[in-house]
C-alpha cells in the first residue's frame, strides 16, 4: 500500500523515516483511501501488543545501555522514545485515539486485511490471520523508537516459554526426556513435526530448522542473515502481570487525553510500578 504512496520498505530505516512516511499518509489519507496504522486497541484481546511487546523496546535499550539483562529497578531511560512511538500509533490510526479502549485485536486484523491501514504491529504467529491479503502484499519492519544505532536493528525475536526437565524425576525419566527433546530438533521426523505447516510451525534455533512456509518467518530470518541485530524479548524480566496491566491502563488513559500529566501516569506505572512489583515478588 505504501508503494501507492510512492514509498518502499527501503525508505524506512529509522524512527525519523517512519514518522515522515506515517505523517505523509495521514496528511493524504482522504486522497489515498487508507490510514497509516491499524487501531491500537486496548481491550484485553489487543493491549498485550503495547503493554508488553511495545514496552519491550525501551526495556531492551535500557538493558543494552547499562550492560544488564535484568533489574529490580528500571529507570525508564527510553520512556520518551516509548511516548514518541505510541503517539505515532494513536494519532495516525484508523480511529480517534479516544476510542482505543474498546478497540479489539479483531478490529486491527480487519482493518489491515481490508486495506484500511498500512502498518499493523504483530508477530510471525499472526500470519494465519492476515494471509488472505496475499504474500506479495506483506512485509515486516523493525519497531523503530529513535534509539541510538537503530539503523542496524532487526526484528524483535524471542520466546516467553521454555522446556524444563524435572530434576526430581527418576534418572531414567530424565534421560528419556532429554533424548526426546534431542530427537525433536535433530531427526528428520522430529524437525518436520516441529517446523512444518503440517506440524507446529515453530522456528527452532538449530541447524536442522526447516525453511518455513510462513513468509513472515523467512523475512525475520533474512534480517538476521543480513547482519541486523535482533531485539531480545525481555518479557521474562517484567516483574508481574499486574505491572503490565497497570501500564496498559495508563497508556489507555493517556491515549484518551494526551497531556503531560497523563504521560506522567505512564512513567509512574513503568518505573515506580516496576520497583513495587519486583519487591513484592521477592517477599
Sequence positions of predicted segments:
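Extracytoplasmic/periplasmic substrate-recognition and gating elements
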Residues: 5, 132-198
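Extracytoplasmic/periplasmic solute-binding protein
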Residues: 16-71, 117
Amino acid at each position: 500500500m505504501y508503494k501507492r504512496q510512492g514509498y518502499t520498505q527501503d525508505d524506512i530505516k529509522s524512527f525519523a523515516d517512519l514518522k515522515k512516511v506515517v505523517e505523509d499518509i495521514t496528511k493524504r489519507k482522504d486522497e489515498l483511501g487508507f490510514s497509516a496504522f491499524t487501531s491500537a486497541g486496548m481491550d484485553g484481546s489487543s493491549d498485550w501488543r503495547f503493554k508488553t511487546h511495545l514496552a519491550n523496546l525501551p526495556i531492551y535499550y535500557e538493558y543494552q545501555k547499562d550492560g544488564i539483562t535484568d533489574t529490580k529497578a528500571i529507570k525508564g531511560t527510553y520512556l520518551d522514545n516509548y511516548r514518541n512511538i505510541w503517539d505515532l500509533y494513536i494519532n495516525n490510526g484508523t480511529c480517534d485515539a479516544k476510542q482505543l479502549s474498546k478497540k479489539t485485536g479483531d478490529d486491527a486484523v480487519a482493518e489491515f486485511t481490508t486495506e484500511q491501514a498500512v502498518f499493523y504491529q504483530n508477530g510471525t504467529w499472526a500470519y494465519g490471520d492476515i494471509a488472505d491479503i496475499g504474500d506479495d502484499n506483506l512485509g515486516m519492519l523493525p519497531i523503530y523508537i529513535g534509539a541510538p544505532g537503530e539503523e542496524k536493528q532487526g526484528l524483535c525475536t524471542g520466546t516467553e516459554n521454555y522446556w524444563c526437565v524435572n530434576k526430581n524425576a527418576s534418572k531414567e525419566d530424565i534421560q528419556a526426556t532429554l533424548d526426546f527433546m534431542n530427537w525433536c530438533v535433530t531427526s528428520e521426523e522430529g524437525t518436520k513435526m516441529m517446523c512444518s505447516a503440517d506440524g507446529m510451525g515453530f522456528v527452532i534455533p538449530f541447524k536442522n530448522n526447516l525453511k518455513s512456509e510462513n513468509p513472515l518467518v523467512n523475512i525475520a530470518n533474512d534480517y538476521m542473515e543480513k547482519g541486523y541485530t535482533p531485539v531480545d524479548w525481555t518479557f521474562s524480566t517484567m516483574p508481574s502481570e499486574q505491572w503490565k496491566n497497570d501500564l496498559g491502563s495508563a497508556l489507555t488513559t493517556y491515549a484518551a487525553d494526551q497531556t503531560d500529566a497523563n504521560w506522567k501516569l505512564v512513567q509512574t506505572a513503568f518505573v515506580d510500578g516496576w520497583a513495587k512489583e519486583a519487591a513484592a515478588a521477592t517477599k
